Structures are given as C-alpha cells and as structure tokens.
C-alpha cells in the first residue's frame, strides 16, 4: 500500500485536508497553531485505490519545547512516505518557513513524488504569486479548499493515478485495543516500545499527546491495532477547547476498542485522576488490563512489593476487580510480553462459549444451594439460563419476576458463573428477564 504524508508549516490546513480526504473527522482541527503533534495514520480510498495517509505537525523555527520533536516526527513521515503533499496557505502567503520546508524536501525527499498544494483558496485575496510557487521546483501545483472541498477531485486523481487497484485493509482480522491513563503515565512510551519506533512524541511534560492515533502492527503473527489517546485530566483542568475535544476523542477511542489497557504510574502513589480514568474503563464494560508502568523506577523493592501494589489497586479500583494486572517498564522494554500474553488470555475468555446444559446445571444448583433473600414482596427463582452473542460473556436468566432480585444475590450468581467457567479476567453481564417474555429469535 502506498503512503502519502502531508507536511507544511502550522495552520495551513493539514489536518483539515487529512479529514477531507478521509471524509471524516480524524485529526483535531483548530485555529491555534501546533495542534497536531504526532504522526496520525489512517487508510484512505479513491477510485478503488487504497493508501495510507499521514498527518504531521507543523514545521517552524520556534522555542516551543515540542518543536524539535515535531520536526523529527515530520522527518519520520517523509521517510515512510512514497508521496508527499507540501501544503501552503493562499490566505497567509509564502514565508521563510515555507521556503525552509521546500529546501528540506529537496534534500530529504529528492527520490519521492512531491505535490505542491495551495489551500484556503476560498479567500477573496491570494497573498502569493505563481512565480514564487514555481520557484520551489516542484512543477505544477493544485489549488484547493480543504474546508469547502474545492479542487479535491483533481488532487485525489493526481495522488492515486500511479497506484495499483487493491482492496482495503481487512480490519476485521485485527484485534483493536486502546491505551488510556492520566497524562504522563507513559502511554506514548508504551506505544513506541510496542511499535519499535518513536511514532508518538514522548516528553516529560504532561499532555504531549492530543490526538488518539491508530497504529496497525503484528506481534507473533497476530494482527493488532493499538490506539494511543490523550491523557484524561480532571475536569477543572480542561481549559482549552482542544483539550476538551481530546478527552472526547479518548472516549471515542474506547468505543472503537475491543480491550482497554489502563496505564498507571507505579513509581508514585495512585491519584484521583487514575480512578476517574478507571471509571471510563468500567463504564465501557469491555475487557480491561491494568498496566503498572515505570516498575523499574521503584527503589527498595522486595519479594512482597508486587503483591502490596496489587492489593492497593484492588482497594482503589474495586469496580475493576476482575481486571488482570501486569507490571512493566515501557522505556526499558521490560515485561512487555506479559501484556500480549494477558491480552490473549482475556480474548479467549471473552470469546468463550458455555454449553447451555452445563450453564443451567451450575446456575440452577447454585440457586437451590443458597436460597435467595426475600425482596420487594417475593423471592427470585431461576428457571432457565442461556448465553447470548456479545463482545463479553453475556447471560440471560429467566426468572419468576426480576423485581424480586436483590443485588447481593445477583453478585452471588455472577461469582458462581465466573468460578465454574473460568471467567475471572473479563467483565460479564447478566440480564434478568421474566420467564414469560421471549428472547429475540426464540
């Protein structure tokens, strides 16, 4: 699959163009320069041709602590790409930053196809002349408005004209999981270690990742997609519109995932923010693995330290009592294999199907062994249980009247199912239904 990278100075509309090509909002768009910091990847399609598209941060000369990292990310993207879109703005005109980028592309991308694109042509006045553009040495250029879609057909035709026809990536084969956590717990370091390259900006200052970013990779011949997300801050600290949108992006990333890696910083006490993020995982009701990062930073560890930390996690994250816990050091690439071993364990449990006869045998016996307490004028009685298709183990329990169910008895039945069929590392859902109501399809 061919790869196309979009490069340019800040605020020329790179993310708007990225979103326009994909026909959906993937990158954060804002008038504030420097909003895109990492390389963002997604698969585009035009005229039955598939291609990988990369959005990059803006290149400028600046004292911004992130700028050197952003420029390095752009160079990574240029090296990966077959074709480069060099984007300038008709609204702002050509300046020294554009000229420096043109010079860099001549040096770093001399064997690649570079397409010069002038964005924001919906403006009434153009602050450049065509001779200035031709002086860059990239030949003809395209005039577009990414925001309004003007000129996009011609640009896309040019992008794909030499590409072979091929099918889209079979994303259904890939297991998709996201990495969440408060800022600066090491989410991007973990992503980089897994991918084997520095695709995400890693900086000691909290909040260096704003976009959620999809990365396809293989591990031991199994296909995965990993989504790194912006760190979730306390509500009082979300002051920028961009930060608010990044939190929403984290929630959307969770919705698109089959599993969550909840990353904690093991080198310091767990914080209220950690519990807030853990609450997002609980609300999602999908498999979750708690990843204790920076384990090598803990001094004076002994044979009991790991168990003590596990006990603390179980105390603070009672609502994730079923979630497995692993200990890693992302920066040092230590114990990363335990994440994938645990992912496969959790996947197997999430997909496990129980024979209806065995399920009923266990639940009916449990119901008879421990008499349910009277509640709201009656006592719950289970007559039949069936497992239904879902992303996590889900069971419908036919009973005399669901209003008679006390929460403590529901927990007892859930625990009996977990013990009997080995569902100790995944969430499970029980639906209590009047036995006179039929399930869909019955």
From Swiss-Prot:
CDD domains: EngA1, EngA2. Pfam families: KH_dom-like, MMR_HSR1. The keyword Endoplasmic reticulum does not apply. Residues 352-436 form the KH-like domain. GTP 1 binds at residues 8-15, 55-59, 119-122. Residues 2-167, 175-351 form the EngA-type G domain. One of its GO terms (biological process) is ribosome biogenesis. One of its GO terms (molecular function) is GTP binding. PROSITE patterns: G_ENGA. It comes from the Bacteria. InterPro entries: G_ENGA (IPR031166), GTP-bd (IPR006073), GTPase_Der (IPR016484), KH_dom-like (IPR032859), KH_dom-like_a/b (IPR015946), P-loop_NTPase (IPR027417), Small_GTP-bd (IPR005225). GTP 2 binds at residues 181-188, 228-232, 293-296. Keywords: GTP-binding, Nucleotide-binding, Repeat, Ribosome biogenesis. Associates with the 50S ribosomal subunit. GTPase that plays an essential role in the late steps of ribosome biogenesis. Belongs to the TRAFAC class TrmE-Era-EngA-EngB-Septin-like GTPase superfamily. EngA (Der) GTPase family. HAMAP family: GTPase_Der (MF_00195). This is GTPase Der. It comes from Ureaplasma urealyticum serovar 10 (strain ATCC 33699 / Western).
């Amino acid at each position: 699959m061919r790869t196309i990278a979009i490069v340019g100075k800040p605020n020329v509309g790179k993310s708007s163009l990225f979103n326009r090509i994909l026909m959906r909002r993937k990158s954060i768009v804002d008038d504030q320069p420097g909003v895109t910091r990492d390389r963002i990847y997604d698969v585009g399609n035009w005229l039955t041709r598939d291609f990988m598209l990369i959005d990059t941060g803006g290149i400028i000369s600046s004292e911004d602590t992130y700028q050197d990292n952003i420029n390095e990310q752009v160079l990574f993207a240029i090296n990966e790409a077959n074709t480069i879109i060099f984007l300038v703005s008709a609204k702002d005109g050509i300046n020294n930053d554009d000229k420096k980028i043109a010079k860099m592309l001549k040096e770093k991308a001399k064997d690649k196809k570079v397409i010069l694109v002038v964005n924001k042509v919906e403006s009434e006045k153009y602050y450049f002349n065509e001779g200035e553009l031709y002086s860059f040495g990239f030949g003809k250029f395209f005039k577009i408005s990414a925001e309004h879609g003007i000129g996009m057909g011609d640009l896309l035709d040019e992008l794909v004209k030499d590409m072979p026809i091929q099918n889209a990536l079979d994303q259904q084969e890939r297991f998709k999981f996201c990495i969440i956590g408060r800022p600066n717990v090491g989410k991007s370091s973990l992503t980089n270690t897994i991918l084997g390259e520095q695709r995400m900006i890693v900086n000691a200052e909290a909040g260096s990742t704003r976009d959620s970013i999809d990365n396809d990779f293989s591990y031991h011949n199994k296909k995965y997609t990993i989504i790194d997300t912006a760190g979730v801050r306390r509500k009082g600290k979300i002051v920028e519109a961009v930060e608010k949108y990044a939190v929403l992006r984290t929630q959307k990333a969770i919705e698109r995932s089959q599993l969550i890696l909840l990353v904690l910083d093991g080198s310091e006490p767990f914080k209220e923010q950690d519990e807030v993020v853990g609450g997002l995982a609980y609300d999602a009701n999908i498999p979750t693995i708690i990843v204790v990062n920076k384990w090598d930073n803990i001094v004076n560890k002994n044979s009991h330290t790991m168990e003590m930390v596990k006990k603390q996690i179980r105390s603070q994250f009672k609502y994730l009592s079923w979630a497995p816990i692993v200990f890693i050091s992302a920066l040092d690439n230590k114990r990363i294999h335990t994440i994938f071993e645990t992912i496969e364990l959790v996947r197997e449990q999430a997909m496990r199907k129980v024979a209806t006869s065995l399920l009923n045998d266990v639940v009916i016996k449990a119901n008879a062994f421990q008499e349910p307490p009277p509640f709201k004028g009656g006592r719950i009685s289970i007559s039949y249980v069936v497992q239904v298709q879902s992303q996590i183990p889900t069971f419908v329990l036919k009973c005399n009247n669901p209003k008679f169910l006390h929460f403590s008895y529901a927990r007892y039945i859930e625990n009996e199912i977990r013990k009997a069929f080995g569902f100790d590392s995944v969430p499970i859902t029980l639906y209590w239904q009047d036995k006179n109501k039929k399930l869909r399809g019955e």
